[in-house]
Amino acid sequence: MANQEFTTGSLGRRQFLKLAGYGTLGVLAGGTWPFIDLSAASQLEAADRKSKFLPDLDLSLIARPAQVPIFPGEPTQVWQYQAIVHKGGRDRVIKPPRSYLGPIIKAHRGEKVRIRFRNDMPEKSIVHWHGLHVPAIMDGHPRYVVSQGESHLYEFEVKNRASTYWYHPHPHGRTGPQVYRGLAGL
């Protein structure tokens, strides 16, 4: 009688082998994980293929530590934005001479802009497009901060008239210190 109670709640041989087979497949499939390309570039390329957003201007904006000769002597440690244009012409991004500030980004009303922000700094950050009329999720709100090594994709249409607008970091409680160190551009 005790033997019947034990076998009623137990797995049968076939069911056990079936579950063991599924487990083995799961372990083997999981073992390929380190070989899958999860680089930021491949993730952005995959997102581009899925997106129906066709930008007129497409660039990467990278926040990173740098050393810049601001005064004679030793270079000054700063944080700065660097841009790489993927589409739209290299003349759309201008690095101001003798400045540690970020590049000037030229965009026109009605253009669709894609900016791939990557944070290579030792603290969280996000980019706020000061004065531009963009959707809330694209406005660099502090709740969207990204950690070091992470990225945030901005896609928006420029709806503003011609003017000078600046962009800057917008992490909660760290906007000022990050701007003072050089994270700002036009």
PLM region descriptions:
Residues 1-15, 22:
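N-terminal secretory signal peptides
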Residues 9, 31-67:
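C-terminal segment of N-terminal export signals and the immediately downstream linker at the start
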Residues 12-13, 48, 91:
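Short, intrinsically disordered low-complexity segments
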Residues 15-39:
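N-terminal export signals
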Residues 17, 23, 44, 54, ...:
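Compositionally biased, intrinsically disordered low-complexity regions enriched in proline and serine
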Residues 62-186:
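Histidine- and aromatic-enriched segments that form or immediately flank copper-ligand environments
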